Amino acid sequence: MVKQLIKKFLTPAQVDQLYRRTSGIRARFSRHDLKKLALLYGSDKWGAHWYAQHYEHHFRPLQNRRMNVLEIGIGGEDKPNSGGASLRMWATYFPKSTIHGIDIYDKSFLQTDRIKIYRGSQADAAFLNGVVGGIGAPDIIIDDGSHQNEHVLQTFEILFPLLAANGIYVVEDTQTSYWPDEGGSSDDLNAPRSLLTFFKSLTDGLNHAEFIRPGYVLSYYDQHIVSMHFYHNLVFIYKGRNDEGSNRVVNNQIRRK
């Protein structure tokens, strides 16, 4: 009844403006529930996808910290004044953090004191280095960009080294690893340069101390990935110092008893 009256007396633009203002007020009462926040702001992280429950599990301990949160892909494509649902959601969920958004389209209308917008490509190393150089090391990076396998891998190779120590890197919509149109494959589940082939390969590095490979040279990922969590279409990668030793192996050789 109320919705019908509002639509009767207000233009679509006014309805949209009213909804945005009231959603912010309603969101304050649901600040600790990402599923509700996603629905309030219209983010596809709950409903179209089922990511909010996993984000809550990993992010809840960080909720009241002061952080730099960087999300690639703002949404709305080239439609004017469209997109930004998840940026608003993160700004509410992390009340002490600054939320940074990257998109190839102009999304400057979303800029606020706590939401910062940058226009450029996620595959442009100079652009990404410039953004991080300006804002400092992100504590959380979320890749919700083009989802093309090549772009996802290029972005990770550029940004993971720039992620803060003990930071979290998230890749959404990993189903494109199986889609040929996006550079993936369902026939070869170990296709070279498939994004999940790459991320699965990094799991062995968690146990580099156990390799029986004398002279083995550690990669950056061996040294700095401390855990990985795989969900339906979603991967979390934790950064830290992966320097736990083995109880049997020394310098990649078995220690004789």
Segment roles from a protein language model:
Residues 1-142, 146-171, 175-257:
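A short alpha-helical cap/connector motif
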